[in-house]
C-alpha cells in the first residue's frame, strides 16, 4: 500500500466547504477525469476516472463507499476500480477531515495500491500524481464556492477535464524535484549553522 498524507487549504470557512466536499457529485466534478455514473441501493457510488498518458488512456471503473461523520466534518472513503483495457486494478482507503475557522484545512490520510501494468508507474510516481490531483481539486472546489457566492445560488458545475498524464506527470516531476531540492538545501543549511 502506498501511503499518502496530504493537507491543503481552501480560503473559506468549513461551514461553506464541508457541504460541498461531502457531496459526491460536487467532488467528482472537481476531480480531473472523474465522473459519477450511479448510486447503488447499498449506498456505494459507482463511477470512473480517466487518465491520459500521451496516446494511452486508462479508464478505471469502480465504486466508492463513503461513511460520513458530519458533526466533526470527517469522511472515510473506501474505493476500488479496474482498468479493463489494461487489466490494472486499484484500491484506496482514505480518511478526509475538514477543520479551521476562516480557512478550511483539509487533511487526507490513507493509501492506495495499483496492481497490473500500471503498478510500476503508481509505485514510482503515484504520490506525486495524487498531490497534483489534490491541488487541482482544491482549486476547483474553491472556484465553485466563489461562483456560488457571486451568483447567490447553486452554480452549475462543469465537469473537470480528463486528467492529462503529460500535464500531471510534468507537474508531479516538478513537485518531486522541488522536494529533493528542498531536502538537499535544508541539509546544507543545517550544516552551515
Question: What is the predicted role of each segment?
Answer:
Residues 6-8, 34-35, 61-68, 79, ...:
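Hydrophobic/aromatic beta-strand elements that line small-molecule binding cavities or substrate pockets
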Residues 80-129:
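Beta-strand/loop substructures that line and gate deep hydrophobic ligand-binding cavities in soluble
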Residues 39-80:
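Glycine-rich portal/gate segments that line the openings of hydrophobic small-molecule binding cavities
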